[in-house]
C-alpha cells in the first residue's frame, strides 16, 4: 500500500548533511528528491562527477554504490528523516533531465525534447531539436530548421535525446540515428535491504 501521509522534515538539512560526503567522493549533487513509490518513500540523489563533460555525469555503478553506503551512514547518525524509506543514488543518465538555465547553456548544440506548459508561438507543445543560445529567461530550440524561442518559465520538462553515431556504409556519409528503444532502458542495481531501522539502499546508474 502506498503511504498516505508525507513525512515532515527539512530536505535542506539533508542536502547540507550529505554535501561533505559527496565532496569526499569528488561528485556533486544534481538533484535531491523525496518521492512516493509503491514500495514506500524514496530519497533519491542524482550525482555527477565534478567538471564532467558528458551528459551521463561520468559516474559508474560502483561510484553510486560507494556514495550510497556513505550517505546512508551519515543519515543514520544525523537521524533527519522520521520515516522508513529507501535510499537511491543514481547518475543523471544520457537522457538527463534539464532543470536549470545553466544546464540548458551547458548542453547547447545537443538534441533535446522540451515539453511546454503553454504552446509555443507556432502552437507546438513539444519541441524536439538542437538547443540554441537564447537571451536570459528564454530557451531556444532549432526545430526542422526553424528557431523557436519560448520563456524558460513555460518549460514543463526537458530532457536530452541520446543519439547513437551510426557507422557509415561505403559511399555514405556518417550521421546520427536515434537509439533504439531496447537500448534506452535504465539499468538498476539493487542491494539487499539493510538491517538498519529506517532504510534500504539502492545504488543505480542510468545508462542509455
Curated annotation (Swiss-Prot):
Does Glycoprotein show up as a keyword for this record?
no
Keyword Cytoplasm assigned: yes
User: What Pfam families does this protein map onto?
Assistant: DUF150_C, RimP_N
Q: Which GO terms describe its cellular component?
A: cytosol
Where in or outside the cell? Cytoplasm
Q: Which domain of life is it from?
A: Bacteria
Q: Where is this region: Disordered?
A: 165-208
Read off the InterPro entries from this record: Ribosome_maturation_RimP, RimP_C, RimP_C_sf, RimP_N, RimP_N_sf
SUPFAM superfamilies to which the protein is assigned, alphabetical = YhbC-like, C-terminal domain (SSF74942), YhbC-like, N-terminal domain (SSF75420)
GO biological process, alphabetically ordered: ribosomal small subunit assembly; translation
Q: What is its main location?
A: cytoplasm
Q: Which UniProt keywords apply?
A: Cytoplasm, Ribosome biogenesis
Q: What does this protein do?
A: Required for maturation of 30S ribosomal subunits.
HAMAP family xref list = RimP (MF_01077)
Please give the name of this protein.
Ribosome maturation factor RimP
Amino acid at each position: 500500500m502506498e503511504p498516505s501521509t508525507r513525512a515532515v522534515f527539512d530536505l535542506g538539512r539533508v542536502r547540507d548533511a550529505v554535501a561533505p560526503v559527496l565532496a569526499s567522493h569528488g561528485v556533486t549533487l544534481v538533484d535531491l528528491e523525496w518521492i512516493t513509490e509503491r514500495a514506500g518513500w524514496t530519497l533519491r540523489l542524482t550525482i555527477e562527477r565534478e567538471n564532467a563533460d558528458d551528459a551521463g555525469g561520468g559516474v559508474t555503478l560502483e561510484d553510486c554504490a560507494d556514495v550510497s553506503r556513505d550517505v546512508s551512514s551519515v543519515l543514520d547518525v544525523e537521524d533527519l528523516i522520521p520515516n522508513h524509506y529507501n535510499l537511491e543514488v543514481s547518475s543523471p543518465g544520457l537522457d538527463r533531465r534539464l532543470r536549470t538555465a545553466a544546464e540548458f547553456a551547458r548542453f547547447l548544440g545537443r538534441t533535446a525534447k522540451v515539453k511546454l506548459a503553454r504552446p509555443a508561438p507556432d502552437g507546438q507543445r513539444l519541441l524536439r531539436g538542437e538547443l540554441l543560445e537564447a537571451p536570459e529567461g528564454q530557451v531556444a530550440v532549432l526545430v526542422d530548421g526553424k528557431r523557436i524561442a519560448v520563456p524558460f518559465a513555460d518549460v514543463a520538462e526537458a530532457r536530452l535525446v541520446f543519439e547513437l553515431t551510426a557507422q557509415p556504409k561505403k559511399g555514405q556519409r556518417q550521421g546520427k540515428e536515434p537509439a533504439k528503444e531496447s537500448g534506452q532502458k535504465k539499468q538498476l542495481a539493487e542491494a539487499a535491504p539493510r538491517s538498519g531501522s529506517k532504510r534500504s539502499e539502492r545504488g543505480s546508474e542510468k545508462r542509455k
